[in-house]
Amino acid sequence: MKVGVIGAGVMGRGIAQVSAMAGHSVILFDINHEMIEVAQKAIDSNLKKAIDLKKITTEEKDATQERIQFSNSIADVNVDLVIEAIVEKIDVKLKVFNELAEINKENTIYASNTSSIPLTQIAAGFKYPQKMIGIHFFNPAHIMKLVEVIRAEQTSAEVLDIATNYVSSIQKRCIIAADSPGFIVNRVARHFYVEGLKILEEDVASNETIDELIRSAGFKMGPFELMDLIGVETNLSVTESMYELFNYDQKFRPNRIQQKKVQAGYFGRKSGQGFYTYDK
């Protein structure tokens, strides 16, 4: 299968890497040339780490990289499966999807990696609604085993089968989720972040203490470490979307501390500053 990944950010390049490692031909597209360069270096670094951990051989690394084509031209994205991993704005996603629909063949499938936008709503604005589906990876995509597959009201049974087979082919655990706000994982996880922010806001504990306690309870990361990894602005966008989709239920209300971080440009690891400070 030839896979086209739209967006060379952290999520997009992870999806491209894991697809290529599974033997799929991949084209990774981004309009930003610098993002392409960063993605190339990040994938190379990830694969070198995998060699050091004896998970792959040098030959497998080389073969994986040979399967990935990088491009700044959307006209190059002529594939069997499109996976979009761009900004969480439906108008931007639909513009890209409908542009790709003019380039690709009739049997191409279109998937969104959206964290919270209803797939039925995306499909409704797309030229081929029956070919739209959600394939939601978790960060970092080349490591995290779980993938949610979300069927829109319009998605055909054939497209659902192809999507689930693709997820299985890249050695991920596939969970079929209903098209509801936040799907399964993000709906449950929202309280992980929201309550952590409330505790910080009420001066019950510092973000360092909260993260340390959560790790001590068996979690790999605390809420603030995880927000910095995902992107504070990305996490806030999901919370805002779910708050609106759940008719402004207060349990999903965005927190002012997080909003101020975003306003200041403190996005986490990617910017060098979030709830913690990082070397860029």
Regions found by a protein language model. Give the residues of each.
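NAD(P)+-binding Rossmann beta1-loop-alpha1 motif at the extreme N-terminus of oxidoreductases
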Residues: 1-49, 53
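NAD(P)-dependent Rossmann-like dehydrogenase/reductase catalytic/cofactor-binding core
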Residues: 22-27, 168-179, 201-202, 207-280
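A non-catalytic, amphipathic alpha-helix used as a structural packing/dimerization or gating element
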Residues: 34-45, 92, 158-169, 209-212, ...
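Rossmann-like NAD(P)-binding element
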Residues: 38, 49-109, 117
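A general alpha-helix detector
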Residues: 46, 145-146, 192-196, 222, ...
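Rossmann-fold dinucleotide-binding core
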Residues: 109-179, 183-187
